Amino acid sequence: MARGYPMAEQNITFSRRTLVAGAAGLSGLALAQRATTRDELVKLPPYGNGTIGSGIRSRLIDNVNGLTVHILEAGYETPGRQLVYLMHGFPELAYSWRKIMPVLAAAGYHVIAPDQRGFGRTIGWDPSYEADGNQFRILNMTRDAIGLVYALGYRSVAMVVGHDAGAPVASWSALIRPDIFRSITIMSSPFEGPPALPFNTANGALMPRPPITDDQLDAELAKLNPPRKYYQNHQRTRGANDDMLHAPQGLHNFFRGYYYFKSADYKGNNPHPLKARTAEEMAQIPHYYVMLKDKSMAATAAEAMPPADYIANCKWLTEAEVGVYATEYGRTGFTGALQGYRVRRGSDPVSLAEMRTFSGRSIDVPSQFIAGKSDWGVYQTPGVAEKMQTTACSKMVGFHRLDGAGHWVQQEQPEKVSELMLEFLRKYGKA
């Protein structure tokens, strides 16, 4: 049974001091690594701390592949609308779509954005570091998506959208179930397609050379001067959660520095295609992806902390909005959100084997790609952006890199992103 608590009916204002204090006070739950109960969820302050428009409501959906899923929802008032499904990345939340949802709803769509498994107010997943990886592998995350669509009474989705870590979930959903997910917008993280099984080897074809693993890349990065390391390897470690949750600069300032570092406002972001996945080439990438070996992620974000005048005048991410992320992650910690790094195909043989089941398949529904021109996520894995456009997506109709945006493109340039989505939906979004 789906239950809701509409935001429009909430009228509570939070000061920054309240937000920060609340985050600190609630962080004990994360420390205990204890699963939040549904009763505890419904007693929490309203989602978004008053920073979300009245046309968006917050709602809990039970019995979704073992989860109680928290969603933001817009355009729900009118029955029979086509569904648009938005998947966030890391370290984000359903909240990251707050600027996009009202525009799509005003155009006549029913728009949903869940807190993904491991994030925010969605519960039912194991919050411990030792959690069974199966619950966070891509096929189970795809089942989460299908289960939510069905729970809402739909058989198809006009457009699924995935940003950052949400991009592979959206991509695999569209590849595996094109009957449900009728078109896709991939954002910031290009889709490489399924890993290939060896072909024609019985007739003399050579086995393909295996790609360099993250561990092999890390070993080469460590030889550089100064030594470096790949961020995904760091994020798989047990200490990654505490590093960010208890950042010396405070959780609020961690988010401010991290979001700024990967945005177009940080002038050191000048992404371009790399020749190969070698240490020398990868060393061109900023420290948030190819970190200094002796620095944590919290220290990496601290090195990019913007000045006070920038913070006071930042329109795309206000202090109150940063406070929403700090409050939610202060309550949950990062462990669940980090589990995806541990079961990505490059580091997890079980995931690799599962994905090879789909060797030779492509996304065959209409697709487009959107990213900021200042987003290194497009090129951090050499060759993938090109492969997405030639083989991984058979109906790629647009590859868009937007001025004035870095990694957080839907928050930095929501008007441009919404315009591209609506144009795409008008042409291809027939559920």
What are these regions (language model features)?
Residues 5-26:
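N-terminal secretory signal peptides and thylakoid transit peptides that target proteins
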Residues 39-58, 69, 77-78, 83, ...:
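Flexible "cap/lid" subdomain of the alpha/beta-hydrolase fold that forms the substrate-access gate
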Residues 58, 111-113, 399-401:
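Conserved beta-strand scaffold positions in the cores of enzyme catalytic domains, especially
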Residues 64-66:
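Glycine-centered tight beta-turn/hairpin loop motif at sheet-sheet or coil-to-beta transitions
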Residues 72-125, 163:
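Conserved HGGG/HGGXW glycine-rich cap/lid loop of the alpha/beta-hydrolase fold
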Residues 90, 94-97, 165, 172, ...:
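Signature tryptophan residues that serve as conserved aromatic anchors
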Residues 396-431:
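Catalytic active-site module of serine/aspartate enzymes centered on a nucleophile-bearing elbow/loop
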